[in-house]
Regions:
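Extracellular/luminal Protease-associated
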Residues: 112-221
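Soluble metallo-hydrolase cores and metallopeptidase-like ectodomains found primarily
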Residues: 28-30, 104-105, 111-146, 211-290, ...
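N-terminal capping segment at the start of a domain
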Residues: 27-61, 205-210, 219, 282, ...
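His/Asp/Glu-rich mid-to-C-terminal helical/loop segments that flank catalytic regions of hydrolases
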Residues: 305, 309, 422-460
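Noncatalytic luminal/extracellular "stalk/propeptide" segments of secretory-pathway proteins
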Residues: 48, 52-163
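Short helix-loop-beta-strand segments that form the rim/entrance of peptidase-like active sites
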Residues: 45, 305-331
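Metal-dependent peptidase/peptidase-like ectodomains
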Residues: 110-112, 125, 220-225, 230-231, ...
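Bacterial Sec-dependent N-terminal signal peptides
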Residues: 1-27
C-alpha cells in the first residue's frame, strides 16, 4: 500500500471513529432529554396553569398582561441565567357582548346560528339584517356583478379541502376568505360578510381569526359561522327557502397600547451568538389558547428547562422568547427582530412551535444548503422517537421577521401531527382538556433535542 493510500485509509478510520463517538454521545444525550421530559416533565402542569389560571390572552387585554407576568415568573422559577421583558406596542380589539345571529325562513320561522366576529371587525351598531347572497369560493365573489351583491349580506361557503393530507395546506387555500372577504364584499356594496369557519369537522363551533380592511374601502362587519350552520344555510339557500340573515355584534377597535415579549436565556461560551426558540403568548379570546399557542409556549419553556436541568453547557446563548401579538399584528415578532439587530447580536438560528401540542412528526429547515445537508443527518438520531419529516422550508410568523434583519439566519419549524389541529384552531374548543399530556411532553423533548443538536453540530 502506498503512503498516500495508507494515510487516506487511516484518515477514514479516524473520521469514522469520531463520527461513531459523536453519534453515541448524541444518542445518549437525546435519551436523557426524552427521559427527563417524560418522567420529570413540567410542560403539562405549566400549560394547565396558563390555560386555567389565566385563560384566553388577546393582545391588549388584562389576561395578556397576566400572561406576561406568568411567563416571567416561570422562567425565573427554572433559574434561567437572565429573564427580562422587551417592550412592544400592540393593537387592542375587543369582542364586547356575545354575538347573536339568526336566519329567517320563508315561512317566518327563526333559527339561531352559531356566529363569532372575526378579529379586527367593526360591530353592527345594533341589529343588522339583510338578504343572503352565497358564493362557494372567494374567486366567485370577485367575479360577481355589483347588482348581485349590493345591499346584501355575503355568505362565503368555501370549505377546507378534506383530500389534503397535511391540513395546513387546506387551511392555507381557504385563509383568504377570512383575511380578504370583507374587502371584496365591500367593493361590491355588501352590508356585511359571513364566512364558513376554517375547520374540517362539521360541528357547532365557530372559529375566529384575523381579518383586515383596506384604506378607501368602506368597512363592513365580518363574522364566521360554524361549519354545521354553514351546511344548513347552503342547503336552504339552494332551495330558495332562506329569507334573510340577522346578526348583532358589539366588537370595537381601540388605540394601540404597550405590552411586552418575555425573554429567558442560558448564556453560551459565544454569548453574543444566539439560537432562539419560541411561540406566541397571546391567543384569541375564544377557548383557552391551549394548542394555539399555549403548547408552543410550554414546549420551549420546557426545552430550555430540560437542558438547564441536565447541566448542558451550550456553545451559543440559548434563548426562549414568548412573543406577544402573533394573532393580530405580529408586533412581537417584528419588534424583536429589529431590537436584536440594533443590539449587534449575531442571531444564527431560530425555531418556532406554533402548530399545537400533538405527536411530533419532524422539523422544517429554511437555511443554506450546507446547513440543510447537516440538518437531514439528524434524522438517524430521531428514529427511535418516530420523527420522520425533515423538509426544506420552516419557521413561523413570529420568527419570520428575523430573515429581514439577518438574511443568513436559519429558521426551523416544529412539525407535529396536523390532523386534529383545525378541530380546535381559534375556537371555544381549544382548551386544556383537549391536549394530551404525553404528546405535549414528546414535543418538548423533540425541541430540546433539536436545539441541542443545532448548538453542538449544525452551527459549531
Amino acid at each position: 500500500m502506498s503512503n498516500h493510500k495508507r494515510c487516506l485509509f487511516v484518515s477514514i478510520l479516524i473520521s469514522g471513529f469520531f463520527l461513531t463517538q459523536f453519534y453515541a454521545q448524541d444518542s445518549l444525550m437525546l435519551r436523557r432529554i426524552y427521559t427527563e421530559a417524560l418522567v420529570n416533565g413540567k410542560s403539562y402542569e405549566d400549560l394547565r396553569s396558563l390555560c386555567k389560571d389565566i385563560g384566553p390572552r388577546l393582545s391588549g387585554s388584562s389576561e395578556a398582561e397576566m400572561a406576561i407576568r406568568w411567563g416571567e415568573r416561570a422562567m425565573k422559577k427554572y433559574n434561567f441565567d437572565t429573564v427580562y421583558l422587551q417592550p412592544i406596542e400592540v393593537p387592542h380589539w375587543e369582542r364586547g357582548n356575545p354575538e347573536s345571529a339568526w336566519i329567517e325562513l320563508k315561512n317566518g320561522k327563526l333559527e339561531k346560528v352559531n356566529l363569532c366576529a372575526l378579529g379586527g371587525s367593526i360591530g353592527t351598531e345594533g341589529l343588522l339584517e339583510g338578504e343572503i347572497v352565497m358564493f362557494n369560493h372567494l374567486d366567485s365573489l370577485k367575479k360577481a356583478k355589483r347588482s348581485e351583491v349590493e345591499g346584501k349580506i355575503v355568505f362565503i361557503n368555501q370549505p377546507m379541502n378534506p383530500a389534503e393530507i397535511t391540513t395546513f395546506k387546506a387551511y392555507g387555500a381557504c385563509y383568504p376568505i377570512r383575511g380578504n372577504g370583507a374587502v371584496e364584499a365591500s367593493k361590491l356594496g355588501a352590508k356585511a360578510v359571513i364566512i364558513r369557519s376554517l375547520g374540517l369537522p362539521i360541528d357547532e363551533f365557530p372559529h375566529t381569526g384575523s381579518m383586515h380592511y383596506e384604506e378607501g374601502i368602506p368597512k363592513i362587519p365580518a363574522a364566521a359561522i360554524s361549519t354545521l350552520d354553514a351546511e344548513k344555510m347552503a342547503e336552504l339557500a339552494k332551495a330558495k327557502y332562506l329569507k334573510k340573515f340577522m346578526m348583532e355584534m358589539d366588537c370595537r377597535n381601540f388605540p394601540n397600547q404597550p405590552s411586552f415579549n418575555v425573554i429567558g436565556e442560558i448564556k453560551g461560551k459565544k454569548s453574543n451568538e444566539v439560537i432562539s426558540m419560541g411561540g406566541h403568548l397571546d391567543s384569541w379570546d375564544q377557548g383557552e389558547g391551549a394548542h394555539d399557542d399555549g403548547a408552543g409556549i410550554v414546549h420551549c419553556l420546557e426545552a430550555l428547562r430540560i437542558l438547564k436541568t441536565l447541566k448542558y453547557k451550550p456553545q451559543h446563548t440559548l434563548r426562549v422568547v414568548f412573543f406577544m401579538n402573533e394573532e393580530n399584528g405580529n408586533m412581537g415578532g417584528k419588534t424583536y427582530a429589529t431590537w436584536v439587530k440594533s443590539k449587534g447580536e449575531k442571531h444564527i438560528a431560530a425555531l418556532e412551535s406554533d402548530r399545537g401540542g400533538f405527536t411530533p412528526r419532524g422539523f422544517g429547515c429554511d437555511g443554506k444548503d450546507s446547513v440543510f445537508k447537516e440538518f437531514v443527518k439528524c434524522e438517524e438520531l430521531f428514529k427511535p422517537y418516530d420523527l420522520h419529516i425533515w423538509e426544506k422550508g420552516g419557521g413561523g410568523v413570529d420568527i419570520g421577521p428575523l430573515k429581514n434583519e439577518f438574511p443568513d439566519i436559519t429558521l426551523f419549524g416544529f412539525i407535529p401531527d396536523s390532523q386534529r389541529y383545525f378541530d380546535f384552531h381559534h375556537a371555544d374548543s381549544d382548551v386544556f382538556e383537549n391536549v394530551n399530556k404525553r404528546e405535549l411532553e414528546l414535543g418538548a423533548a423533540a425541541i430540546a433535542s433539536m436545539v441541542y443538536l443545532m448548538d453542538k453540530h449544525l452551527f459549531h
